[in-house]
């Protein structure tokens, strides 16, 4: 099997994978808003079962730090809007990326509070608490490392509930602390809760284009427990009322999208119930409810939880909660993508340019795989040397396919040739290629990362299609330089058009991925010449016998 035939095999595998990915995406379509018109649900694990209230109207206060710009509703203390000043909405835009939003077109909120028998957020106790706040705007001043936003509510019995948001400079993790002061004569039973709710359907202004030519990043819910480190939960599963209902000591719940995430991390010193809920009107939720805490008369009890609202920065997320960094969507090849990203990030710490880092990592990967590449070309050379014997065998045995197969395998064994030896190294490269794709599409560090000249975003396609064309040219040169024994006219035509077909495929791929493939092809050309020189000395290759 020669290199051009191997190329055809890889192309077929590649196209088959694309079709499979597209089918996976299409067979689980997102539910349409009009299909979920109910306003409540009583499914197991629903928000109603957990005693989690609906949103209400209150005064909006703003909180600004160096990395967050939040809007909090004093009715319940929910975060209804979150802007990320460090991340523009689009490349070259001065408008910050909006993660949380509350508009008629789209809802994405981070709710929290105190429910349970005596909790002010328990629907059975009336409307959600209307907190008192000292001022309408809070700003983390220059030189200030921490900002506290206290909100206080006193119920009819005189019990005081204080909810304090604690922000730190440069941090996307927000501590939400609760203080319950019991001024009555009976114990108070309260439970902290945290809930994320979001509209299933994306309006046009929220579509980030995370689906790219059949490969797409995950948008949905997720959770983590000590037993299940990371589990995705699709929005359409929640909309179908197939709800989550598990108890866990520790862990977290989250909502994910390309590059960004929100997550509630409760305290791990008690048992928490994780749930999902279909809230109706095309809105779904995931949340937690902590085990009840008894506050004795005359006593004050403190509780806390943490909200992550921001980019999926892996090292910072890992420091907030175990396995929270797994929310970075590297797909089913995460075990390859994660080491690749760590290596890429290490290289970037020296180089300072993600594009040059990709070039260097390409040389490293291809260098590591050089022994396999050499074995591949050696195997193909031996196969070419056997072609006269194989052809004579076919003529001698005629239509006896069984005898042909038996004698061919005996010939391979005698000559110590593996007929699949030329294919295996190329098949190994395909997972690396796809893992790099997921890494480019899932790592926030590569979002809007420039390279050079006209490439201003390595995670987006080349706007002028120059890189895909260069990739096609390098592929054409590899094809022309590779010996072939293909005689079938149809296969020859397919081989001729293969660079064109791949160029068309790569038009929509991230430019960082195309850059990797171009450099990989250039390395292939260099390695090819070195290997052929060695094979010539062994009598396994002749440039004169090369067919174009």
Curated annotation (Swiss-Prot):
Transmembrane regions listed in the UniProt entry: 6-26, 350-370, 424-444, 458-478, 499-519
Task: Tell me how this protein sits in the membrane.
Answer: Multi-pass membrane protein
A Pfam family per the record: YidC_periplas
In this chain, composition skew of type Low complexity spans: 29-42
Compartments in which it is found: Cell inner membrane
Instruction: Give the InterPro entries listed for this entry.
Output: Membr_insert_YidC, Membr_insert_YidC_N, YidC/ALB3/OXA1/COX18, YidC/Oxa/ALB_C, YidC_ALB_C, YidC_periplasmic_sf
Q: Name one GO biological process term.
A: protein insertion into membrane
What keywords is this UniProt entry annotated with? Cell inner membrane, Cell membrane, Chaperone, Membrane, Protein transport, Transmembrane, Transmembrane helix, Transport
Gene3D superfamilies from the UniProt entry? 2.70.98.90
Q: Where is this region: Disordered?
A: 28-56
Q: Which GO terms describe its molecular function?
A: membrane insertase activity
What does the entry list under GO cellular component? plasma membrane
Role according to the record: Required for the insertion and/or proper folding and/or complex formation of integral membrane proteins into the membrane. Involved in integration of membrane proteins that insert both dependently and independently of the Sec translocase complex, as well as at least some lipoproteins. Aids folding of multispanning membrane proteins.
- What does the subunit comment say? Interacts with the Sec translocase complex via SecD. Specifically interacts with transmembrane segments of nascent integral membrane proteins during membrane integration.
- Family classification: Belongs to the OXA1/ALB3/YidC family. Type 1 subfamily.
What name is this protein filed under?
Answer: Membrane protein insertase YidC
Name the source organism: Salmonella paratyphi C (strain RKS4594)
What is the gene called? yidC
């Amino acid at each position: 099997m020669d290199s051009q035939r191997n190329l055809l095999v890889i192309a077929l595998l590649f196209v088959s994978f694309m079709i499979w990915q597209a089918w996976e995406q299409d067979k689980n379509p997102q539910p349409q808003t009009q299909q979920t018109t109910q306003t409540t649900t009583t499914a197991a694990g629903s928000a109603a079962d957990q005693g989690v209230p609906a949103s209400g109207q209150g005064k909006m206060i703003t909180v600004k730090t160096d990395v967050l710009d939040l809007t909090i509703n004093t009715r319940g203390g929910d975060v209804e809007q979150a802007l990320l000043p460090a991340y523009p909405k689009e490349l070259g835009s001065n408008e910050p990326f909006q993660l949380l939003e509350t508009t008629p077109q789209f809802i994405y909120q981070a709710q929290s509070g105190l429910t349970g028998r005596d909790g002010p957020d328990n629907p059975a106790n009336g409307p959600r608490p209307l907190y008192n706040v000292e001022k309408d705007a809070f700003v983390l001043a220059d030189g200030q490392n921490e900002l506290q936003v206290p909100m206080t509510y006193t119920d009819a019995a005189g019990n005081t509930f204080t909810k304090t948001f604690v922000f730190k400079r440069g941090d996307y993790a927000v501590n939400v602390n609760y203080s319950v002061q019991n001024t009555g004569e009976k114990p108070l039973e309260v439970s902290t809760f945290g809930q994320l709710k979001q509209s299933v359907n994306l309006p046009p202004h929220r579509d980030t284009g995370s689906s790219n030519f059949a490969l797409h990043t995950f948008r949905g819910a997720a959770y983590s427990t000590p037993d299940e480190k990371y589990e995705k939960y699709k929005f359409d599963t929640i909309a179908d009322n197939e709800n989550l209902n598990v108890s866990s000591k520790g862990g977290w719940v989250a909502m994910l999208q390309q590059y960004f995430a929100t997550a509630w991390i409760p305290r791990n010193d008690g048992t928490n119930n994780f749930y999902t809920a279909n809230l109706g009107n095309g809105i779904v939720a995931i949340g937690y409810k902590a085990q009840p805490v008894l506050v004795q008369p005359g006593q004050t009890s403190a509780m806390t939880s943490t909200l992550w609202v921001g980019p999926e920065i892996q090292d910072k997320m890992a420091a907030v909660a175990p396995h929270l960094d797994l929310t970075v969507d590297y797909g089913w090849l995460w075990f390859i993508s994660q080491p690749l990203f760590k290596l890429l990030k290490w290289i970037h710490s020296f180089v300072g340019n993600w594009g040059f880092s990709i070039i260097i990592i390409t040389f490293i990967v291809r260098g590591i795989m050089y022994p396999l590449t050499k074995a591949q070309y050696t195997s193909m050379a031996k196969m070419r040397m056997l072609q006269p014997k194989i052809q004579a065998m076919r003529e001698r045995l005629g239509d006896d396919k069984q005898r042909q197969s038996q004698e061919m395998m005996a010939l391979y064994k005698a000559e110590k040739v593996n007929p699949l030896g030329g294919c295996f190294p190329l098949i190994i490269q395909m997972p690396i290629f796809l893992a790099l794709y997921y890494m480019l599409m899932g790592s926030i560090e590569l979002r809007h990362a420039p390279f050079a000249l006209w490439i201003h975003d390595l995670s987006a396609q080349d706007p002028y299609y120059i890189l895909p064309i260069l990739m096609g040219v390098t592929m054409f040169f590899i094809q022309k330089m590779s010996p072939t024994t293909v005689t079938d006219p149809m296969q020859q035509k397919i081989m001729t058009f293969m660079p064109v077909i791949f160029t068309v495929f790569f038009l929509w791929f991230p430019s960082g991925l195309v850059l990797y493939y171009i450099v990989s092809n250039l390395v292939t050309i260099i390695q090819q010449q070195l290997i052929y020189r060695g094979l010539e000395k062994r009598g396994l290759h002749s440039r004169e016998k090369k067919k174009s």
